Amino acid sequence: MLTRPHGTILLCSIANFINSADQVVMPIAIVAMTDEFKWGLHGQGWVLSSFAVGYMSSQVIGGSAAKKYGGKKILLLSVLLWSMSTFIVPFFAHSIFALTLSRMVLGFGEGLGLPTIYHIFSHTIPCEERSRAFGYLVALGSIGQTMATVICAHLNWRWAFYSFGSLGFVWAFIWIYFYKENRSSNDEEFVEPPKVNNINVHWSEFICHWPLWSIYIAHFCMNWSNYIIMQWLPTYLLRSLNGNKSDIMLTAAPYVLNSVVGVVAGHFADSLIVKHKWTVLSVRRLMTSVGLMGPGLFILFFSAVNNLPLAVLFVTICLGLSACNSSGHLSNHAEVAPSHAGITFAISNTLATIPGIICGPLTAELVTQSHGRWFPVFIIAAGVNFVGAIIYLSQSAASQVL
């Protein structure tokens, strides 16, 4: 049985691989689906954003349920739910209303996943290995996005949903057989006890501490630009930079670099703490600064060029640097709230999903009002990143507050 940290990291990272792959299928497939069903730009925006409605609604449920019933059961439920919802998309594609509902269910299932994984990691992964653990988690997610981008470009859009929807069922069998929770309780054992074991915390405590809000805001700002890239990059390359369908494969490049940087940044961050004796707070602030300010700068470069290869290069660097956040604010939950990391991440991810809901329709409206120009979309995204970095640098902490 895989009870050791490395086995836990592997299985959870594979789950995130499938999670991230399933998220990318629709932004790729929607180009062909739009040609077949004659959807307008606003219709596409709502289809893309409906996922985020379900995703946001289940974050706190996932963190709380994992704490009460154990991570194994909730992560299994999450993967099965989002996999089924991916598999059945072709059956609902004839109706935007039905498709929107199925996308919400997909989002609800995926929304249970990451808070549950954070709960599992905070209870089973030692502090000095957490940056690497979250680095691998993010890296496998990026690899999933990369593979989905490349494979979906060569598949009929219906088979794209069938193929990636099936992966979760295979993972479920492996998870049931290999992952074993502590039988003595519904909760995994802490690998290191928290300084203060605050089991019963009032809900108001989760929104009353600036170190927590610095994490929430940084996560929100990171996702603003990430959602724009994930949702609209294929459409932008095809419609604005005159790319062709084979150029869609170029959108895999950002996810490749993201996966590499996620792993490298994790090892680098842990080495700063263990070998070079940096404080945990200094490392979290450094990695978050690079992960927010770097993408903010390169998304401005991306918006200023009309050359497709150069645009892909800039957006690749943008998403690559964003992976540094996995060793920054995304790893900070287990330090400020070790007993409640699943719930704090759920709150953070709920707020960070708001851009996923509004960026689709907002982008469509901004581009329409700007007569096809995308610059306002990207300048806002860059500004949001810079604001997030400043707030995290000034308000973050690495000591326990809950």
Locations of regions flagged by a protein language model:
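Extracytoplasmic
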Residues: 7-41, 229-234, 359
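Residue-level signature of mid-helix packing/kink "hotspots" within the transmembrane helices
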Residues: 24, 52-60, 111, 145-146, ...
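Extracytoplasmic gate region of multi-pass secondary transporters
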Residues: 26-27, 209-266, 325-326, 330, ...
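Conserved MFS/SLC helix-loop-helix module at the cytosolic interface between two early adjacent transmembrane helices
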Residues: 57-97
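C-terminal ends and interior cores of transmembrane alpha-helices
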Residues: 80-94, 289, 293-306
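Hydrophobic core of transmembrane alpha-helices in multi-pass small-molecule transporters
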Residues: 85, 97-112, 298, 309-325
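Cytoplasmic helix-loop-helix junction between adjacent transmembrane helices
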Residues: 102-141
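Helix-loop-helix hairpin linking two adjacent transmembrane segments in secondary transporters
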Residues: 137-183
